[in-house]
Every structure is written in C-alpha cells, then in structure tokens.
From Swiss-Prot:
Family: Belongs to the eukaryotic ribosomal protein P1/P2 family.
Name of this chain's protein: Large ribosomal subunit protein P2
Source species: Brugia malayi (Filarial nematode worm)
HAMAP family in the cross-refs: Ribosomal_L12_arch
Assembly and interaction partners: P1 and P2 exist as dimers at the large ribosomal subunit.
Keyword DNA-binding: no
Keywords attached to this entry: Phosphoprotein, Ribonucleoprotein, Ribosomal protein
Basic and acidic residues bias (residue ranges): 92-102
Amino acid sequence: MMKYLAAYLLSTMSGNKSPSAKDIEDVLGSVGLDVDMEDANKVVSALSGKSIDEVITAGLAKVSSVPSDAAVSAIAPVVSATPTDALQAGSKKGETKEGPKEESDEDMGFGLFD
C-alpha cells in the first residue's frame, strides 16, 4: 500500500489536486512497478476529499500515540547481570533456550485507512 500512497503524494506534489488510480498507475509504471488497480482504487477512495495536510496531521497524531524505544526503555525494569548469574545460568543443564521471537510490524496500531 505504501507504494500507492507514495505515488498518490507524488501526483499531488506535481499539481494534480485529485489523482486517480490511472495517475497512480502512470507514476508506478514509470519506474517499472506492477500495479494492482484494486489497491490503487482503495488508496484513491480513502484519500478523496482530503487534503494532504489533513492526512499528514492525522498520521502524525497516530504516530505520536505509539511509544518509542526511549519511552519503553524508561519504563522497563533494570536487570543487572553479574558474572555469578552467568555461571549459574550456564550450569543449568537440560534447559533449552528459545531465540528471540520476531515481532510483527503488520499495523502497529496505525490503521492508515481505518
């Protein structure tokens, strides 16, 4: 969806006040990208009647509601690992360690087109 949004913004920046799905297709096609017209139409319908300034302001409000790493680290408890802790952890046999789980960055609570 981001490529369609970027193409929409490029069209508006070039002076087109109301870009269509065809305009998005032209922008993306100029750099050799495939276009799904259903997604292009979804972006156009979601942004029709809205100024780019409104969209940016709404996006900034949503971004500011998501905690950043600095805020999370300030809230997180401080854990101290001493050499004896490492030795005790290393002496436990039969335990398997799980690797870090991958995080999903699917929506992150933004819901751009909600």
